[in-house]
Amino acid sequence: MQARRIARELALMSIGQMPADRSRLQAKNLEELVLASVRTLREEANESLQRACTELRQGHNRLEASELTAPTVEAARREVAAAIALAEQAINRVGASLELPEFVRLADELQVRAYAFELLGAFVREGDNLDKLLDTCMEGWQVERLTRIDRDILRLALVEMVELKSVPFRVAIDEAVELAKKYSTDTAVRFINGVLRRVVQHLQLEQRPRR
């Protein structure tokens, strides 16, 4: 996993925990938000594994029940199919859970947290201006009407594209799309991609020479 990708996810989780009035947030507050996000990830890993165990037990129980209580062959097949679906769901959940410990370990690394702090600091300073830019570039929408997760993904992308200029705008868009795939909906993926491309056109980023 790339350090900056993990930092973006930490920053995204931290923004969601910020108070509406960001003016009094200090570096210490930002650090506490990031640490709270890491703790949340640990808890999610444990809960996901527990749910996987529960689903496996449920699948096993349905298989046993199908042998004893199913009145017809067709009913037995349905029970077996349901048991297999539960098992597959559990396996997928375990696979996702196994990635989280590595994610959490890397999230504790200095360079990851440093970039997360940098993203959050820029957002605290320039968040209002970024929201105005989004309002200008969204067709028929306002920032306040967006779901929180979609709004924060867009804000983070603008922090990297406009404020920090820490990655090429194409990378910022691609990373925002990946965050949307993980944390939001298919519709949001297309929406976020479209909004950020309108930002690029509005700021004429494609016409600027690459550094």
Swiss-Prot record:
The answer to whether the entry has keyword Iron-sulfur is no
Molecular function in Gene Ontology: RNA binding
Q: Which domain of life is it from?
A: Bacteria
Keyword terms of this UniProt record? RNA-binding, Transcription, Transcription antitermination, Transcription regulation
Q: Which GO terms describe its biological process?
A: DNA-templated transcription termination; transcription antitermination
* InterPro entries in alphabetical order: NusB-like_sf, NusB_fam, NusB_RsmB_TIM44
* Gene Ontology cellular-component terms listed: cytosol
Q: Which family does it belong to?
A: Belongs to the NusB family.
Please describe what this protein does.
Involved in transcription antitermination. Required for transcription of ribosomal RNA (rRNA) genes. Binds specifically to the boxA antiterminator sequence of the ribosomal RNA (rrn) operons.
**Classification via NCBIfam families:** nusB
Record's protein name? Transcription antitermination protein NusB
Please tell me the species this chain comes from.
Gloeobacter violaceus (strain ATCC 29082 / PCC 7421)
Q: Which gene encodes it?
A: nusB
